[in-house]
């Protein structure tokens, strides 16, 4: 996959994209990430990229002729253009899977008060990472790239890891444990030490359902349950009812 990012602050991406799985994916040629400075497309000596908004108001707006030229220069015929914006559709795991199937992405990082509305005609999709305001689109872009990268074949060491993580099946991930088996007065659940793979699988499924019910019950409203999940959920609800 090829990912291009347009930003006024390219140095912000140096450390995050040169660590951990994204670094390995880039070194192996699985992902190509290009960071382009919007200021390189400024059209005056002062390299001005923003200006005061027509009609007055606070803040500055990224200029259409600068950002528009940058998008035209960087994007290819098959590029899907994304603009990180609090006005966009909320990002979720289903959307991440859809974006991970594309070959080329261009992520536009806004700044200041926003971008000239005329550039929006060049944007295919606006994406938000939450209902809060950040200084610019750089941090949301990093979140998006990290989420997408994990789903690309070859990036994670275990191909099943992405499928088993939280939200992949509209469920939160089951509890994880490692050595030592005893920590203070807390013990690792015996089933995980049993070596019985089927019992372990069923325990993890049940724990995922329980954890989702307790922490994110909204996720269960949109999930299609298989027969095993229905049975496990009934066990959970029966147990909770009897504890009252």
Swiss-Prot record:
InterPro entries with a match to the protein in the record: Alpha/beta_knot_MTases, tRNA_m1G_MeTrfase_C_sf, tRNA_m1G_MeTrfase_TrmD, tRNA_m1G_MTases_N, tRNA_MeTrfase_TRMD/TRM10
Q: Does the keyword Methyltransferase apply?
A: yes
What molecular function terms (GO) are annotated for this protein?
A: tRNA (guanine(37)-N1)-methyltransferase activity
Kindly state one GO CC term assigned in the UniProt record.
cytosol
Is the keyword Electron transport in the record? no
Q: What is its EC number?
A: 2.1.1.228
Localization per record:
Cytoplasm
Among the GO biological process terms of this entry, one is: tRNA N1-guanine methylation
Question: Subunit structure, per the record?
Answer: Homodimer.
Q: What protein name does the entry list?
A: tRNA (guanine-N(1)-)-methyltransferase
Give the organism, scientific name. Answer: Syntrophomonas wolfei subsp. wolfei (strain DSM 2245B / Goettingen)
């Amino acid at each position: 996959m090829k990912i291009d990012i347009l930003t006024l602050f390219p140095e912000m991406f140096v450390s995050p994209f040169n660590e951990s799985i994204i670094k390995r994916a880039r070194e192996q040629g699985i992902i190509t990430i290009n960071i382009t400075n919007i200021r390189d497309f400024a059209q005056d000596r002062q390299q001005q990229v923003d200006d005061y908004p027509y009609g007055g108001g606070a803040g500055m707006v990224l200029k259409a002729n600068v950002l528009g030229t940058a998008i035209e220069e960087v994007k290819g015929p098959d590029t899907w253009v994304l603009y990180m914006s609090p006005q966009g559709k909320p990002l979720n795991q289903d959307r991440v899977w859809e974006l991970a199937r594309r070959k080329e992405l261009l992520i536009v990082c806004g700044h200041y008060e926003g971008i000239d509305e005329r550039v929006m005609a060049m944007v295919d999709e606006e994406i938000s990472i939450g209902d809060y305001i950040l200084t610019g689109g750089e941090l949301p872009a990093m979140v998006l790239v990290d989420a997408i990268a994990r789903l690309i074949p070859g990036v994670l060491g275990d191909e099943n890891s992405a499928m088993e993580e939280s939200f992949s099946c509209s469920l939160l991930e089951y509890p994880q444990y490692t050595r030592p088996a005893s920590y203070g007065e807390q013990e690792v659940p015996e089933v995980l030490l049993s070596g019985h793979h089927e019992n372990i699988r069923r325990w993890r499924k049940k724990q995922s359902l329980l954890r989702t019910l307790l922490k994110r019950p909204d996720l269960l409203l949109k999930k299609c349950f298989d027969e095993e999940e229905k049975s496990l959920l009934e066990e959970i609800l029966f147990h909770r009812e009897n504890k009252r």
